Amino acid sequence: MKDKSIKVLEFNKIQEILKNYTCTKAAKDIIEDLKPYDSMYEVREHLEETKEAFKLLITKGAPPFEGVYDIRSGISLAEKGSALLPGQLLKIAAVLRCARRFKEYINHKEEEESYRVLENICEGIFSLPKIEEEIFNAIEGEDEIADRASSTLYNIRRSLKEKNYSVRDKINSLVRSYSSYLQENIYTVRGDRYVLPVKAEHKGAVPGLVHDQSSTGATLFIEPMSLVNLNNEIKELMLKEKAEIERILTVLSAKINANITGVKTDANIVWELDFIFAKAKFASEYNCTCPTINDEGIVDIIEGRHPLIDRREVVPISVKLGEEFTSLMITGPNTGGKTVTLKTVGLIHLMAMSGLMIPARENSVISYFNNVFADIGDEQSIEQSLSTFSSHMKNIVEIMDKADENSLVLFDELGAGTDPTEGAALAISILENLRKRGTKIIATTHYSELKAYALRKEGVENASVEFDVETLRPTYRLLIGIPGKSNAFEISKRLGLPDYIIDFARENISNENIRFEELIENLQEKSIKAEEDARLAENLKLERDKEKKKYEEKLEGLQKVRDNALIDARREAKNIIKEAKEEADKILKDIRQLERMGYSSDARRKLEEERKKLKDKLDSIEEKEIKTVHEGEALKNVKEGDEVLLASINQKVIVLSKPDNKGDVLVQAGIMKITANIKDLRAAKGSNSNNSSSKIKKSKKLNLNLRRVESSVDLRGMDAEEAIYTVDKYLDEAYLGGLGEVTIVHGKGTGVLRKTIMDMLKGHSHVKKYRLGEYGEGGTGVTVVELK
C-alpha cells in the first residue's frame, strides 16, 4: 500500500482518533504502526476481533482495563536481572491481574455466545496469580512496603516502633527540663535523629552533638548525649529495614525474571486487547458496522459517511463498483462534493483493510485490494518547480506503472490543468488502459467528453453529485447512472450575471449540447424523486417496525407484570396463613404450659378452633391450586432446559439446574429465578420434560436493546438513602445486562457511605461476593462486586 495514498486519504487522522480510546502507550504505539494488512485472511480475522470486542462492549460493558500500565521499561530491567522499584513491581502485578481478569471476562459467557478470535488470543495468557498475589501482599504503594512482606521486616518495624516510643518519652522529658534554653518547647528530627532546638547563646547548657542550625544561626539543633545510644539503635534498625526491603524487592524481581516469558506474553496480550477494544470503542462512537470482505473487486458501500466530517453535517453516500461496471465517472461542477466522495470511498477501504469497522450501514461490501492509489488535490510543488498538471502527471505515471486488476485507483479531476481538449483525450486514454487491465476506477471530472465516454463504453458508468442551484451549494448526494451537468448558466444567473450575457452564451452552444444538458437535468429530477420516494417508503417501514416492536415490548412487559403479581400474591397469601398457623401453634404450646400449671383450658379450645379454621383455609387454597395443575404425578427426574409446570404457582417454568440432595432445583418463571422442590414439578402440556427435544438455552435476560450498562457507578456526593436506591437500581441493570463484575465508587471520606453500601450488599440477591478495591482500582474508595 502506497504511503502517499494513505497520507492523502488522511488515514493518519483516524489513527490519532483511535489513540484516544486506548489505556496504554504500548497500544498507542500499535496504532501508530497500523496499516492495511497484506492478505484478505488477515483483514477478516482483524475485523472479526473488532466485531467481537464491539459485541462484548454492548453486552458486558467496559472490559477490565483498570490499572493497566505500560511496563516495558520494568520488563526490560527485570530481564537484565536488575532489582525493580516498588512502583514498577506494582504495575507489573496490575498488568498480570488485568490479563487474568480479562481471561475470566471472556470465559464468563453464556452457552450460545462465541468469541472465537478473542478466546484464541486469551488462550495465550499464562495467568501468574501467585506472583501477582506476592507482589500485592508485599507492596502497598509506589514507595510503601507492607509489614507483612516478611517476618523479618515485621520484627524490625516493631522494634523500631518501640525504640521510637522510648526515645520520644525521653526527649519529651528533656524538653521539659531544658525548656528555658529552647527556642520552642518541642523536639524535631534531623538526619533521622531526635534533636532539640536550642538557642545559640545557651548551647553549652545542653550537652550533646550539634547536627544543624537555622538559616539565621539563632537556633542550634542539638542531639542530647543521653539520646545518642537510643538514636544509634534507631539508625541501625532503619538500616536493617532498608536492607530487608532491598532483599524483598530483589526476591520479587528475581521471580519476575524467572517468569519473564509469561510476564512479557501476558503484557503483550493485554496491550493487544487494549488496541482491539480501542477499535471497538471507535466503532461504537462513530456508529460503524462490520462489512463483508471479498477479493473479487466488488464494492457496495451503503450510506457511507466520511468519519472526519462533523456527524451533524455529513451526508451519507452509497457507491457500487465491480459488478455491472468497473469504472465510475463522477461529473459535475467544481466544489460540487466530488472530492469528498472519492476520499470517503478511499478512507473507508483503508479502514476496513486495517481491521476497523466502517461508518456505513449494515451489509456494506468492501473488496480487498492489494493497492489503493489516490491522485487527489493540488500536489503542486514549488521546490520542484512543477505545475499542477505536471504534479498530477507524475503521480499518474507511477500509478500506470503499478496498477493491476487487484488495484483501486481514485482520480480527482483527471486531465485538469492543461488544454481541455488534450486533457480530456489524455484522461480517456488513461482510463481505457486501466480498464482493460481490470483495475477498479473512480474518477471525477467536469469534462463533457468523459461523460460521453462513460455513456458509450461498456463497464463504465456515469455518476453525479447533486447540486442545489438555489443555495449554490452541493448536497453531497451521489446519483449513480446520471452524468453531472456544470450548472454554469444557473450559477451565473443566481450570482447576478445579466440575462443578455447568459442568453448570448447559450447561442454559442450547439443544439445537441443543449438537448444533452436538458436530458441530464430531466434524469436528475426523476432520479431525485425516485430516491425520495424510496427513502420515504423505507422511513415508513422503519416507523412501522418501531411501533410494532414498541407494542410487543409493552405487551410482554404487561404479561411479566401480571405473572409476577400473580406469583407474589399467591406466595403472600400462603405466607400470611402459614405465619398465622405458626403463631397459633405457638400460643397453643403456651396454653398447654398454662394447663400443666392448673389454668383453665377454655382458651385452648377456642384457639384450637381458630387454628383448625386457619388450617382448613390453607388446605383449601392448596387444594384449589392443585386442581388447576395439569393432572399427573410429581416428576422423578428433570434436567437443565426442561419446560415443566410448577404446581405451587400453576405456571410453566424452565429448569436451570439438576436436583440437589434435598430435591431442590433452580427454575426460571418469567424473568424470576426461584428454588422449588422436584415434588412440586409436573409435566407441562405439550412437552415431554424427561425427553425434551426443545432445549432452552440457559441465559440471563440480556439487555439487547443496545443500551449500554456502565461497569461502574459513582455515589460520591449522595446521602445514604439516595446511594442505596441508586446501587439497588444499578445492580438490577448490571445483572440483567449480563455484567460479571462492577465497581461502586463511594470515595474514602469518613467511611460511613462505604459501610452503608457493604451492609446493603450482604443480603442483595444479585451479589455473589464483594471486596474493597485493590491498587490501581481505587483502593478503599471503591467496592468491587461480583454478580451471580
Swiss-Prot record:
- Record carries keyword DNA repair: no
Q: Which organism is it from?
A: Clostridium botulinum (strain Kyoto / Type A2)
Domain Smr: start-end pairs: 713-788
Task of the protein: Endonuclease that is involved in the suppression of homologous recombination and thus may have a key role in the control of bacterial genetic diversity.
Which residues of this UniProt protein bind ATP?
332-339
A Pfam family it matches: Smr
Q: Which Gene3D superfamilies would you find in this protein's record? A: 3.30.1370.110, P-loop containing nucleotide triphosphate hydrolases
Stated name of the protein: Endonuclease MutS2
Q: GO annotations under biological process?
A: mismatch repair; negative regulation of DNA recombination; rescue of stalled ribosome
- Provide this UniProt record's keywords sorted from A to Z: ATP-binding, DNA-binding, Endonuclease, Hydrolase, Nuclease, Nucleotide-binding, RNA-binding, rRNA-binding
Q: What Enzyme Commission number(s) does the record list for this chain?
A: 3.1.-.-, 3.6.4.-
Subunit and partners? Homodimer. Binds to stalled ribosomes, contacting rRNA.
This entry's Gene Ontology molecular function terms read: ATP binding; ATP hydrolysis activity; ATP-dependent DNA damage sensor activity; endonuclease activity; mismatched DNA binding; ribosomal large subunit binding; rRNA binding
The record's annotation in PANTHER family points to: OS10G0509000 PROTEIN, OS10G0509000 PROTEIN-RELATED
Q: Can the keyword Aminoacyl-tRNA synthetase be found in this entry's annotation?
A: no
Q: Which family does it belong to?
A: Belongs to the DNA mismatch repair MutS family. MutS2 subfamily.
Name the lineage. Bacteria, Bacillati, Bacillota, Clostridia, Eubacteriales
Q: Which HAMAP family match?
A: MutS2
